[in-house]
Amino acid sequence: MRLAEVDGKALLRRHGLAVPRGVLLRAGEGPSDEAAGWPGFFLKAQLLEGGRGKRGLVRRLENLGEFRDARRLILAALDDADTPLLLEEAVPIAREIFVAVRIDGTRQRLELLLAPEGGDNVEQSAKLARIPIEVAAPATPATPGKIFPVIAKFFPRELAARLARYAARLPDIARQEDLQLLEINPLALTRDGDFVACDAKVIRDDSADFRHDPEDFSISRMLAERAMTALERAARD
């Protein structure tokens, strides 16, 4: 099951990784007082597919006075007034990085991917580090030291060391959560020097559902249910 962004970020937060502050808005709901002090905003449609930016479903707001128009444009593009929206803090970004862990099915192992730039078509870039990770090998204090020399050619030395420590945590998260893919794109290096996961693509193995709380990822489950055809629903039931 692919997770909606809001659920994917909740998973990251549960494992101690920083994500932007955000508020989930359902049909008819507006911004809360909590958002008033944020320095800027993004309004994002919560879907189970990619390509939202190209479809006009992610909008940058300079202030909350732009919220109504942004919501109207997003919902009109979807032709669906019930789509949940994520209102999120705009993080001050100094640099964007790509980091992911996925199952390499051909070799029956995990693969850690890192690139010095985020954005589209990262996996076609020559500047992409690919690091094999044994499925049954949990991270140890030595793991960042194995990642560092592979990525050091792409980043300043101090940043490479910090990023190696950050990336070393992802395979363990993937194992614990039964993930087929955990992609953070972009991972923002903020102007204050912090790492913040600004977007997350997360796919979990459906066959592992029995190991997890059925209440987890409620938005993703609702969206998946809405997307099912009558035949798919009948086959499931």
Model regions and ranges:
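ATP-dependent carboxylate/acyl-activation modules
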Residues: 1-184, 188-237
